[in-house]
Amino acid sequence: MNQGFTAAATLLALLLYLIVSLNVMEARRKYEVRAPATTGNEHFERAYRVQMNTLEQMAFFLPSLWLCAIFLSDLAAAIGGIVWIGGRTLYALAYIHDPASRGRGMMISFVTQIALEADVFSRQTLPCCVCRPGRAVRGR
C-alpha cells in the first residue's frame, strides 16, 4: 500500500512543530527567558504553551492519522491531516496574538482528530454488522 499523501501530511505536521519550537527559541532570546525556565514573560509563555500543546496533540494525532491511512485510505488520512495542520496553525497564530481567541483553531484540529479516531474505531473494533459491512454479529 502506498501512503505517500499521509507521509507528506506527517512531514508537514512535523514542520509545523519545528516552526513552533523555533518560535519558542526566538521568544526566549527576545524576552530574555533563560532555559530551563518556562515562565517569566507573558509573550514567551504563549509561545511555549503553543509548542507544548502542539506536542501533546501530536501524540494522539499521528497514530490516528496513520491508522486512518491503513484502514481507510491514504487520501482520506491526508485530507484529515491537512485540516488538522490548518487548525493547529490557526490555533498557534491566535494564541500568540490573544489566548482568548484560540478556540476556533483548537476546535478545528480537535474535531478532525476525533473524526480520524472515530472512523478507525468504527471500522476496526465495533462488532456490529452496521459498522462493519460483510461481518456477522458475534455470537451468531
Predicted regions and their residues:
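Mid-chain, well-packed structural core segment of small domains
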Residues: 61-63, 68-93
